[in-house]
């Protein structure tokens, strides 16, 4: 029997406490995701070597327990013993390995190890086996597995030849248990983890992937309806803007036509301005005015009224009388108010002066204007003067 130092014993106590806490917390969890081992890294090798050393000591004691295990198989097969792995009757089946550990305690005390440490390790192995098969096995499968697991909780190199016979007896009708027990190396390694990792159905994904619980799945977006209504409102606004844009395009399509019409109007106004510039409004009383500039110069000269009483002496006659015209203006000579009787009829001289001014203002050839002026001088009647006037206008 190998001896344990104080440091190794403290390390085993610490590891067993961690494993027990992991078992307690892992029993209530559903088998949904693959968890991680609660044992720190680097502890597995030390634990496996400790279990092998402990199992090699208890191998003589385990040979005396086949009859007890057969009796426990019969007791567990009864309906009264079909209970979960954490119920009180299940603890009674865990006592034979403990008693075997107590019997082997005297031998271990000689080498320096404590009996309490070995009994606690046995209890820990029993609890780990119960925790592993509890969540996923049925009651019958649990009863078939307990004797095998109790005996398998003491792995050793010496009793490896006795395992196939006990395994065949312990699991007569459970194929799932046979599949787990057939691989001795995997079953022993899983027991060394002390139940921190539950057995679950193998899935396609690897264990390194991060699990995604259903509770953390994001809920469907609740504002999709608001977004859809907003998009519908935006589409309606866009259609309205498109319709208004069509109306604007229809209105602006007439702008080129309006521009062409405005240009035509400008051209017409320019022609009219040219024609108006060529036309002369002649004053019959001022026939000597032959141009528009002369007419404007005459229009600038206007009489100026001097207010005030003034000096009436020049307008008073010797008899003390003053002669006034139609505008009540004083006249120096009263004879100016008396006009001689005039012969009725048009004045030929005025007509000749008017036609002569018209001929001089017209843009004609000098020879043509000279010919018309000679005819005007020779005219002796109103009819001849009017003919010369028409010739000058048609010019």
Curated annotation (Swiss-Prot):
Composition-biased stretches (Polar residues): 89-98, 147-178
Region described as Multimerization: spans on this chain: 222-285
Keywords from the UniProt entry: Phosphoprotein, Viral RNA replication
Quaternary assembly: Homotetramer. Interacts (via multimerization domain) with polymerase L; this interaction forms the polymerase L-P complex. Interacts (via N-terminus) with N0 (via Ncore); this interaction allows P to chaperon N0 to avoid N polymerization before encapsidation. Interacts (via C-terminus) with N-RNA template; this interaction positions the polymerase on the template for both transcription and replication.
Role noted for this protein: Essential cofactor of the RNA polymerase L that plays a central role in the transcription and replication by forming the polymerase complex with RNA polymerase L and recruiting L to the genomic N-RNA template for RNA synthesis. Also plays a central role in the encapsidation of nascent RNA chains by forming the encapsidation complex with the nucleocapsid protein N (N-P complex). Acts as a chaperone for newly synthesized free N protein, so-called N0, allowing encapsidation of nascent RNA chains during replication.
Family, per entry: Belongs to the rubulavirus/avulavirus P protein family.
Protein name: Phosphoprotein
